[in-house]
Amino acid sequence: MIDVRFRAIDEETPGPLLQRQLEHTWPAYRAWYLREGEAARPSYVQCRRMLREHLPELLPTWERLVELAGGGDLEARFLSLYNPPAFIAGCTQALWLHRGPALVRNYDYAPRQFDGLILRSAFNGTATVVMSDCIWGVLDGINETGLAVSLAYGGRQPVGSGFAITVVLRYILEFCGEVAEAVAVLRRVPIHVGYNVALLDRRGRHATVFVAPDRPARVEPWLVSANRQAADARPDDPSVQDSALREAVVQARLSDPGSGLGELVETFLTEPVWRDPNRHGWGTLYTACYLPAERALRLRWRDGEWVQGIGGFQTGERIVSFRADQPHAPRAQFQ
């Protein structure tokens, strides 16, 4: 059995709560950031220059986070999220456009490397609720305009010069209000590893954007994506080579005229889309259902749910236990 702690914190701008998060996670993040040696990471000057060139509106937030981290050179470079070590998050995601809309996704990762932090903030005046990574990066999230985003590893090996996708998603939620604006950001900002980004706004406008360091971003109207960047592609990493199967199962549910949003969410909680974290030391750590019209997030596990939102955000903590024989809880009701 594996236990994973989820915490929800609310901090309008970076302050003591994020400072404590920095202090708690820095030893592990420092080891991760230096795993290829310090020379493999960009200098402070380069990190600052790239932020100023590509994500200038984030500079004040970055500077405040660096201050909270003690002002160290290494901490500043890490927090820029420019050219960090490559990381892989399995993931499956779908866009629901009927009587919704909704963005549903599974986040698949190693429990020991997962922050488990749900963060409500308004760093630059726009309220956001996100699943956080690397202190201020975004795995998935929603902002007060109803724009929802999520990521999945693209399944390709090339690594280049660019930002972690998580800080680019932070930028999108801070400064974009609709899908077209988010797409423009993904087209212009360099990304260091290939990722598939699902976008949805409250009017149902949507896109799946395939970003990579070695080719231009490609925008598609796809409703389902996992860990490949073309319909006939085979992921490079063996841990995500079931991408086609997961996509097919989710697509079949989306295409079923008798299925609603509740049935779609249940598909994400069922194998093969759901993957047991006990089996290989990594797996599905949560299912997220973002509801742009409500500006809300419904986190689901096989034995429970935690509802969050831009309004009525609940701070607190929950321990989620993953057991190999874990039964489903009764299905949550979605309108």
Segments the model singles out, each with a brief description of its role:
Residues 1-71, 81, 98-335:
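C-terminal, well-structured catalytic/ligand-binding subdomain of enzymes
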